[in-house]
Amino acid sequence: MLALDGGGIRGLVTLGILEKIEKLVKGKTGGKLCDYFDYIAGTSTGAIIAAGLSRGLTTADLIEFYTSSGKQMFDPAWLLERIKYLYTADPLKAQLQDVFGRDTNLEPDNLKCLFLAVTKNVTTDSPWPISSNPDAKYNDPARKDCNLRIPLWQLVRASTAAPVYFPPEVVQWDPTDQSKTFVFVDGGVTPYNNPAFLLYKMATEPAYRLNWKKGEDNLLIISIGTGAAESLGATATRPNKNIVSTVAGLPGELMYGIQVDQDVNCRTIGRCTFGAHLDREITDLVPRQLREGMTLEEQYAAPSVPLSTNLGRHFLYARYNADLSDAGLKTLGFPQVDTASVQKMDAVGNIPILLEIGRAAAQAVKTDHFGSFP
């Protein structure tokens, strides 16, 4: 399974990492990513990439889409509209329709593997993860509000409707029932901007009607971010900041914290084979070969337990991301890049460098992290 974070134009970081995975997979199986992964999930920009991969596109196809259309997707709204949002949705809609088709929906014949997009239903004030699983309760073709009939482009647009940046997306399920028309915004404002743990639940929880078997030999989840950097917080250096400045910084802080929490969920329920250190207490949560009397530093540096030793976790898990802090960018080979500029969701002027940052981060990807999965 493959889970892709949200992050606006920073989806190019994701693609830089995916490019490496695609090469490794092709070398082992000869197929595309949709042939290797059975289920691909995405939130916001991750939903664009996940939908493209599920349709059979390559990373080269999607890199071309982002590099050629990225600036048009962030087309400034008219002056009066900017009271509500910064960018008009029309160019993005047109680009999504061009790539996915106006009438392509979630029916199984249209996708090469299972697909999941995370959205936020404003009408019901709840996260709405919508999948192409044909056995799911709300994917029954007999229902007038069957999810499988939603146009793929519109579902992706709903998942990318970031508040402040873009207007919401209105989706009509049943034209004869007004109560089946809902307003959606970006899935990144739910707890699932990193959809990896949600993907695990939707694949294994019986209520979602897939019921895949758990276990290190049965499930592998690869989770990919769009780049991240720790923040000191809205009031860390200026505890008496005004309320407007404080509130403005809260969404980013909350999203980062929730993203890390979902990552920790996966590393504790699953078996982490690779991931960055999370903090000084739990480090990377990769199971290691420890012996009595080791110092903390020695424990952190100890070799990992071989994957041939089954530890009874629910799945194997690898998390790849790029550290966009000053120190992280320097380590990746980009000391001249301004960290604040590349962290912005709409940093379309940094399209080339974001892709290169992703490619540099991809050097960490190894097939050893994938265990026994071919």
Listing of model-derived features with the role each one plays in the protein:
Residues 1-374:
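Patatin-like phospholipase
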